[in-house]
Amino acid sequence: MVLEDEAGSDSIEDLHSNGSLRDFRRTGVVSPGRMRAIDKNAMALGVSGSQLMESAGKSLAGVVMEYAPEKVLILCGSGNNGGDGFVAARYLQNVCDVDLLYYSFGDMTPDAEANLRTLLYCDVSVHRIRCPGDLIAAESLFSKADVIVDAMLGTGARKGLVEPYLSMVRLADSVGAVKISADIPTEGFNADRTIGFHLPKSPESEFVDIGIPLDAEIYTGPGDLTMVPAKKSGSHKGAGGKVLIIGGGPYQGAPYLAALSALRGGADIVRVATPCMMHYPDLIVSPLSGGIISGEHTEELISLGESSDCVVCGCGLGNESHDVIREIAPYFRKVVFDADALNYPLPFGNETIITPHSGEFKRISGSLPPKDLYARGMSVRNFAGSADGRLTVLLKGATDVISDGGSVRFNRTGSPAMTKGGTGDVLAGLTGALFSRMSAFDAACISAWINGAAGEKAAGLYQNGLLASDIIDKIPEIMNMEI
């Protein structure tokens, strides 16, 4: 949440919406990474992992009961997918004979382990697979089962099946039982039905509600941090993203705030192209002649931008350089436009994020965003959607609104102390750092949450004396928090 705004613009949203925010829930297949983020956001809102597992397992058992089976075989791994199977076994114990095979190659997740222990007190035959002989001894269970449930490997599984899962899948596929997969089929398992939890993870999947709060999905949260790509062992310099900041002239500090924020946001290399020369040992500065960015800098800026993963334009730029920005923007793969770059006609790169406040949104769209949050979300989505898939909008306000023309999400982190000048530059640089290594919509959502959360931390120390640079210093703490 960033409250930096123009005089006379509308920055206070009315959270009592005339429409339903449910309309902004996504539909269709969700990626495993996005689903993990939603799960973590639900936990941050007070729904425990054990509650989610209980709901998932109970729903899975309900699907199995539709077949009125006499014998059910449940195949489990050691992760949370296996935990869903343990819960399902408990709910099925009073309606049919239940056998459960599980393989644990290391530590189980705590929730899965707790539900496995509970089965000691249930009418469920539990068989642990420790070696090939254990599976051979259990082979007859496959042919006797009316329904076989696959709860072996979930959304976090790696490609390439290993033993004993390989043999468990082979045995299951060799018999005529109805086969049901929990959340996502284990590789090679020929499921008759796949029951996704909360949202489908594959096109052929059904899905059931497991009680995840609406806000865990349509609002940003700490779970979104799980989507930020981790640096791989052995990565070379620059693998974390190369960001170019183009700005400065009338306002000398703005591009440097954006650049330092990009570094704290994880970018490996940050270069500042500006007429305002300041010395920072962590930054590469490409000084531009004159007092403002002008047409004589066009070729140099295009060259610098083409060698960057993401370009951030507008911080401290002034109004006299807009034509230059419009001319160079199409040469850039990914661009974040902020502040003085947000004028009509709007410049576009190949992929573009803009970070306007309400006044800037009016400048480029012709109208102020509505106060009502639902209408505000629709307004931002419609504007983003008018750009043929090239634009993601991060509208700053008491509640930030983010849309790529299809999806819409909201962010409510932040502090009233963030009305200080420069906070928008910090957000722009952070957005550029994330955008350099992930999709536009995810980068915009996550940067809004991080920036607001860092602002809350800094405001706790400095209250109304907060500086934009104080937010920058808190970014790593937020990005590295335990989720």
Language-model-detected regions and their locations in the chain:
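Generic hydrophobic/packing signal
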Residues: 76, 102, 120-123, 152-156
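Internal gly/pro-rich beta-alpha loop/helix module
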Residues: 139, 146-147, 151-220
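A structured beta-alpha segment of the ubiquitous adenosine-cofactor-binding alpha/beta core
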Residues: 119-141, 296-304, 317
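Short, conserved clusters of charged catalytic residues that mark active-site
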Residues: 133, 163-167, 323, 375-378
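Short amphipathic alpha-helices and their capping/turn segments at secondary-structure boundaries
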Residues: 132-143, 339-348
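Short beta-strand elements of ligand-binding domains
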Residues: 181, 337-339
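Small-residue (G/A/S/T)-rich helix-start motifs and N-terminal tracts that mark the onset
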Residues: 2-104, 109, 113, 147, ...
